[in-house]
Amino acid sequence: MQKKIITHSLLFFVTFLCVITSGKNVLAQDIGGADFSARPILEKHQTNNKTGYWWLDVKPGEEINLEIQINNGKQKNTFDITSNQAVTNPNFVIDYSLKKEEAHKYLSSTKLFDFYNNVFIGDSKNPGSKTIVLQADESKKIPIKIKIPASWKNNISIGGINVTRRATEEEKGQSLVNIYSSAFALILQSGRQDDSFSVSLSAGDLKTDEQSIRLQNYKDILQEKTKLQATIKDQKGTLYSSLDYSSGTIVPNAKIDLPLNVKKELQKGKEYELSIMATKEDKTLKETYLLKVDDKGKVQVTSALKPQKNKSFQLILLGLAALAIGGAGIIIYGTKKRKGKK
């Protein structure tokens, strides 16, 4: 019988714990059976000591020394510790587990801080990874060295330090193998930070029975607590597909396609409106596109619709302008009349 492997990943980012089980994201409070725990040890570069992850203020050319503590459980275990680039995945969730080639598929630029080559773990001379063995009930602090390039300034990048426990020989003999992994965010910022809210919202892959939107962040800006919504409606306002994320994080230089939840299949020869809106605090970005389905069922994006101007607001402005002109005319007329009497 083919063994089924399930990966449980703890993503310590902001205040929640995200467990990835069979590729699905589930909120949880523990990982029963993991047989270990891990925690980042914060130091002087930390911008906020109340967080459970690293957010460091660094300088170009600087070398940072961190530590992560691993507390082993009741049996001897082998751990793989890795450093990876963080990405926003198609579920609008931060993923710290991807290797370099896979992570770059979700980025609009690869000219970022290199978490695979500039981070050294333990005494390993090879960057990006380290394997250790801990005896039962053993605790150990593992050093992490980060080399900041001299040219790296006014930037921000986000990666993650992953601690994965390998399956024991006993677990390997079972039909269901659980692999447990804890991942902690590692955010590096240097110099002045851009606080603007600027992401590209466009149509992704469009078919009659499945659609997606494309989100791109071309800047070195970490967009936290971003609300994302999208709908496809016909001319009568009937909803065909939608997407609604109440909050998510967009990593710097993100490039992701997010699938919509299809309620009805698009019909041949019909027109639809795709509306995409991203909101962060009091800032909102919105794009609207006209979709046309031809007689062969091919969906085409014909144009980006410009938001209609508020006509009532325009009338108010015209009215105020007319009053201003009229008032100025009265003042000039009165002034001339008084001069004539003199």
Segments predicted by a language model, with ranges:
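Membrane-proximal extracellular "stem/stalk" segments
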Residues: Q189-F313
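C-terminal membrane-anchoring or membrane-association module
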Residues: G319-K342
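Sec-dependent signal peptide cleavage junction
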Residues: I20-G33
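Beta-sheet-dominated interaction scaffolds and their linkers
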Residues: R39-G73, N77, Q85, T131, ...
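Terminal connector regions
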Residues: N77-Y106, K141, K147-Q189, K268-T302
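Short proline/glycine- and polar residue-rich coil/turn motifs
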Residues: V58-P60, T131-K140, S247-I256, K283
